[in-house]
Amino acid sequence: MSILNVEKLTHGFGERAIFNDVSFRLLKGEHIGLVGANGEGKSTFMNIVTGQLQPDEGKIEWSKNVKVGYLDQHTVLEPGMTVRSVLQKAFDDLFVAEARINQLYMAMGDANEDEMNAMLEEVGELQERLDSHDFYILDAKIDEVARALGVAAFGMDSDVSELSGGQRTKVLLAKLLLEKPDILLLDEPTNYLDAEHIEWLKRYLQEYENAFILISHDIPFLNSVVNLIYHMDNQELNRYVGNYDQFQEVYAMKKSQLEAAYNRQQKEIADLKDFVNRNKARVATRNMAMSRQKKLDKMEVIELASEKPKPKFDFKTSRAPGRYIFQAEDLVIGYDRPLTGHINLEMERGQKIAIVGANGIGKTTLLKSLLGIIKPLNGKVTRGDYIDLGYFEQETPKGNRKTALEEIWDTFPSMTQPEVRAALARCGLTSKHIESQVQVLSGGEQAKVRFCKLMNEESNVLVLDEPTNHLDVDAKDELKRALQEYKGSILMVCHEPEFYEGLVTDIWDFSKFA
């Protein structure tokens, strides 16, 4: 049975086309991975099917009474609500059913026999619904999911308005899973999860009876939970049976076959054109030349999709710094309350360090405290001599109406326009990306704009906050290569062991500071 039908979907931003005449059908119980390079339109597709974005053309049709759950990381949580009260809202419909049962029992005292029978029948249906959803052990279900995703660690009575962005996303994910909708729409759900929580979510999705569509650049995770791949590429959406690795094999084979057919056809076209040119003027061979020309005219020419630009990262190194990069003495970090005990640490020239640990416990706050962006609650940070810092923030500020071109040009006004364009192109951005407003670019494309800034300023220390969060596989591999070759020091927050292993010299486990 079809849950969702998408017909002839076409959409773009200005002159930049995202989809062209795309159709899609989701069946009950399908576990779909939605994949594609940065900027191909995966998140845009999610926004369209959930009604948050109106397509230029096409039809979106959900089946009746289907319950859709979407992990929207921009959902606003009301100040004053606790973590527990937000999670309880996953069962609002069940609490409504319970209230209706109580209302019916109160009305039975004044009911006649027919009314009583009707009320008892309705109560029976409602009670069956409550029982089938384990209504009377909801608190235990809430606690189980909260522990499994690390939400309980924030404190179930904590005010959600005081949580970090990553913590709020975890709460929203927990609420979504508790709702158990007919279709789950998940956009990079592992970005804010630690290894043990990713493992739990993996098992949950493997056993999930209903359908889901998953966007993720975490390939091992994707491989373990999906049975279908939909690939977004060159404004098309194509279906492949199997997991991501199986898709890669079939896709590579199809691409190779198409290239071979293209090369054969190009040779045939060249031979036909050569024959026509040599023989069209001679009376004896004119008819044969005309016949070859007709064949050329009727030929359906094979076209190869243009190769997507791949980033080529290269970070410039400045002068050598002093021995120490940072020294922290009795450092206590936080905002209204301390997030750590007294921290004493130092970073020396040449070190490449990954800061790891649970999400939302203060890793970004530590970076900002070391950089002087946030004032510590106690202690001091001493920065070494001759330090030239490059800082990569986790997200681009919202509402940036500048184009990517303007963003870089404003930072480096001495560069010419061709130089700015070339710099952005080296980061894997096309002309249409370069001329688009930063706010309409995908998360991965926005990250590439921020990397472009880092690449065009000399540094001897790079401070990177979750640099891989929105990058596709090719961009991650290229970034790792560039950071391995970087001659300076690196301090980064990262939750992907497969990225920082083989790159860093030291690992700081933040849980030892908390």
Each model region followed by its residue ranges:
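Intracellular alpha-helical coupling/juxtamembrane segments of multi-pass membrane proteins
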Residues: 250-305
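Post-kinase regulatory C-tail/linker adjacent to protein kinase catalytic domains
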Residues: 313-315
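ABC ATP-binding cassette signature C-motif
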Residues: 1-260, 309, 318-514
